[in-house]
């Protein structure tokens, strides 16, 4: 899996979880301490999050880290 595929999957999962939990970019930014421009970069598939960012986002969205980085059967 390359970086582009990784960003695509993470972004799609993040967008879905944000919607399920009623968060917009500004709210997620405020709750996680991640800048809004960085959250936007995640959602626009331009920035790969650090492990710390993934854990912080999972905590705020009250989900397992695996829900954000679930790649299904795509890992070879």
Enumerate the predicted regions with their spans.
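The alpha-helix within a helix-turn-helix
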Residues: 18, 29, 58
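DNA major-groove recognition helix of helix-turn-helix
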Residues: 43, 61, 69-72
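Residues within the helices of the helix-turn-helix
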Residues: 15, 26, 55
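Residue-level signal for the short linker/turn that defines the boundary of a DNA-recognition helix
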Residues: 23, 49-52
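Residue-level detection of the helix-turn-helix DNA-binding "recognition helix"
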Residues: 19, 33, 44, 73
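DNA major-groove recognition helix of helix-turn-helix/homeodomain DNA-binding modules
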Residues: 52-67
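Short alpha-helical DNA-recognition segment
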Residues: 22-41
